[in-house]
Curated annotation (Swiss-Prot):
Family in the record: Belongs to the UPF0178 family.
InterPro entries on file: UPF0178
Protein name per its UniProtKB record: UPF0178 protein RBAM_023530
Protein source organism: Bacillus velezensis (strain DSM 23117 / BGSC 10A6 / LMG 26770 / FZB42) (Bacillus amyloliquefaciens subsp. plantarum)
Domain of life: Bacteria
Signal peptide start and end residues: none
Length: 168
């Protein structure tokens, strides 16, 4: 049926999209989202497919190409949704579309911070190509997790008009 597209998403339902291949805060996302009845869609490569996924979780599997998960998210996210990603390039694509974008370390990507993040990424890539390698990011710690939980609760409570204290 040319011209017809079936959408699995309710047009008015807020959704949290998670770039899930390496996301360490999936449990926190599910817990918070269930408390405020917000839909979560985890997007991952087929390389990370698991039969044991909970039936309460919504998983979308994409080809194992480098940007496939990012492209899926960029094509399906709507104004007012929330995206959790560590991909600065994806974050920069989404910011001007009224989408809240945050990292799994609890950092909010904004129009004010994205240029610096993109420049830092560019400079790090340039250094790697010239043979200078730096350490990767530190392992996610409890402080990072707490910062993430606090930020996600704040975003959802502001959007839904509910008290942040009502989200445990």
């Amino acid at each position: 049926m040319e011209g017809w597209r079936i959408s699995l998403l309710n047009e008015k339902e807020k959704t949290i999209f998670v770039d899930a291949d390496a996301c360490p805060v999936k449990e926190e996302i599910m817990l918070i989202a269930s408390q405020v009845s917000v839909r979560v869609i985890f997007v991952a490569s087929f390389e990370h497919y698991q039969l044991s996924r909970s039936k309460d979780e919504n998983w979308v599997y994409v080809d194992p190409h480098k940007e496939a998960a990012d492209l899926y998210i960029a094509n399906h996210v709507r104004s007012g949704d929330v995206v959790v990603t560590q991909d600065i390039g994806l974050a920069s694509l989404l910011l001007n579309r009224n989408i809240a974008v945050l990292s799994e370390r609890g950092r909010s990507y904004t129009e004010d911070t994205i240029d610096f993040a993109l420049m830092s990424r560019h400079m790090s890539g340039k250094m790697r190509r010239s043979g200078i390698h730096s350490k990767g990011p530190k392992k996610l710690n409890k402080e990072d997790r707490n910062r993430f939980v606090t930020l996600l609760k704040k975003i959802l409570s502001n959007d839904e008009g509910i008290s942040n204290q009502n989200i445990e």
